[in-house]
Amino acid sequence: MEPFEQHTGIAASLIQINIDTDAIIPSREIKSVSKKGLENGLFAEWRYTSLNTRKETPAFILNQEPYRRASFILTGENFGCGSSREHAVWALYQWGIRAIVAPSFGSIFYSNCIQNGILPVLLETEKIRKLKTFVELNPAINQLTVDLKDATIIAGNDIRYSFEIEPNNQQNLLQGLDAIGSTLKIIPTIEAFEKNDHRNRPWVYFK
């Protein structure tokens, strides 16, 4: 996983509540455990008029320029609710999404974002509306910047919002560590504990 420190990019607005993981990537789009190609199924029910022909729906924001190159999503409450499928986060990442800004997230989806290099930014609805207004004045030029070290999101010269993120999640993203990487980092601590525990409770280790 790549370290996440700062990112600047185009933001697409999907201001709806309760966008669930089945909307993000329908189950029929999940044909393997591979991440490759999942971006083609991202928001498939909304992006295509026909799932068979893959004819695009012109009105859907990610089918429009410059939003085809969006790396931020501005959205509503409870984004990523529903089933726990990690493919939803994989599809977003494969598309190029690096940060999602919402008032709240599905709890498992939020954790999956952290584990896969997407920054979930918790921000109040009114602040998201102001970001949306800024972006839509000139979406190709009016890009957003998120600085994870400072936990701030920046829009132009006048808008700068702080957001909260648990220190452990922040450090894992900054260092590019998923759950396995975090565990490998503390192997010496684990081995020291096992050695001490073996000495104090030898019966636990009988075979």
Which role does the model predict for each range below?
Residues 1-76, 80-207:
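Cytosolic catalytic domains that perform sulfur/thiol-centered chemistry
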